[in-house]
A protein has these predicted regions:
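Short beta-strand scaffold segments in enzyme catalytic cores
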Residues: 24-33, 107
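A generic structural signal for short beta-strands and their flanking turns/coil linkers
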Residues: 25-27, 40, 72-74
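Compact, glycine-rich, soluble single-domain proteins
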Residues: 43-58
Length: 134
């Protein structure tokens, strides 16, 4: 699946819903499933920072809560208001590894429309998964 220009407009819509009163770092996420459904997510901060949730995890949890399962996802697009695209944090990379195919594209954009694409495996090389627990 290749990046589609409308992904940028969609992810920017999600970003506007960010609840980030402490950092003012608004993150939006747009998830496309293999059956064509779309989900929107955003970061939600908490005064106790560790309790905050990132847009990437919020969107994946939403999709799982609505019946989707690991491997059902086609791509995720994430955007930030920064000079360059920002990559998912370590916790989000681990959740992507758990719920998404290794070759799933992760499109990272910024407010200018710059885009970088990496696969889940590229974002978390030598990632830990359930297979490691067998």
């Amino acid at each position: 699946m290749s990046y589609q220009p409308h992904y940028f407009q969609e992810v920017r819509k999600a970003q506007q819903e960010s609840y980030s009163p402490y950092s003012q770092f608004k993150v939006g996420a747009y998830l496309k499933t293999k059956d064509g459904r779309t989900f929107y997510g955003t970061n939600v901060e908490n005064a106790s920072y560790p309790l905050s949730i990132c847009a990437e995890r919020a969107i994946l949890v939403s999709a799982i809560s609505q019946g989707y399962r690991p491997g059902d996802f086609e791509s995720i697009t994430v955007t930030v208001d920064a000079d360059k695209p920002s990559s998912p944090c370590g916790a989000c990379r681990q959740v992507l590894k758990e719920l998404c195919d290794d070759d799933m594209p992760v499109y990272m954009t910024n407010h200018k429309g710059d885009m970088v694409m990496m696969t889940v495996a590229e974002l978390l090389p030598f990632g830990f998964s359930g297979k490691d627990l067998e």
